[in-house]
Amino acid sequence: MSRYRGPRFKKIRRLGTLPGLTSKRPRSGSDLKNPLRSVKRSQYRIRLEEKQKLRFHYGLTERQLLRYVHIAGKAKGSTGQVLLQLLEMRLDNILFRLGMASTIPGARQLVNHRHILVNGRIVDIPSYRCKPRDIITTKDKQRSKALIQNYIASSPHEELPNHLTIDSFQYKGLVNQIIDSKWIGLKINELLVVEY
C-alpha cells in the first residue's frame, strides 16, 4: 500500500486532530454537516482507528508500520512504548518536533531533497533513526537556510520536548536522549495498535 496523498481534512474529521499530517484546521461549520451518528463502535473499529491515527500522523505505509511493530516486539520493554519511541526518533519526525518543518510530510520533503545534514553528512532517508547526541543541521547553501528560516519563523512556538534542543540562529538541532513517553506528540493508546 502506498503513502497516503489524498484529502487530509477527511482523515482529520474521521480520526481527530493529527498535528503531523497538516498544520491547517477544518472550519467548525464544515464539521456540523454530517454529525456523528450514535452508532455503537465495535472493538475492531476502535483498534483500527488507533492504528490509522498512528499511520497517518507519522506518514507511514502499512508495511512500514508492521515492520516497526515487529522490531518493537523483539525489543525489551513494553511493545507499545518502544514502538512510539522508534517512531518519534525518525529524522522526519524530529525535524517536525524541532519546528524546522510545519508538517511531517514537509519534513520528509526537506530530507528527500538533501537539505538536511546529520553529524555533518547528508542524509536523504526520512526514516533514518536518530540516536542521542546526533546534531541535525541544514546545508550551507542559501536556499536550504532560507527554507528552514521560513519554517521556524512561521511555526507557532510550542514547548520543545526535553529530548531535543534547537539553536534557531545556526539552524542546528541536537538530540539529547531517547524520548520519554510523556513527551510523545500524539495522544494515542498504543496497546490498541499492538493488539490490532
Swiss-Prot record:
Residues 15-36 are annotated as: Disordered. Keywords: Chloroplast, Plastid, Ribonucleoprotein, Ribosomal protein, RNA-binding, rRNA-binding. GO terms for molecular function: rRNA binding; structural constituent of ribosome. Residues 89-150 form the S4 RNA-binding domain. Signal peptide: none annotated. It comes from the Eukaryota. Belongs to the universal ribosomal protein uS4 family. Part of the 30S ribosomal subunit. Contacts protein S5. The interaction surface between S4 and S5 is involved in control of translational fidelity. This is Small ribosomal subunit protein uS4c. It comes from Agave bracteosa (Squid agave). The lineage of its organism: Eukaryota, Viridiplantae, Streptophyta, Embryophyta, Tracheophyta. The gene is rps4.
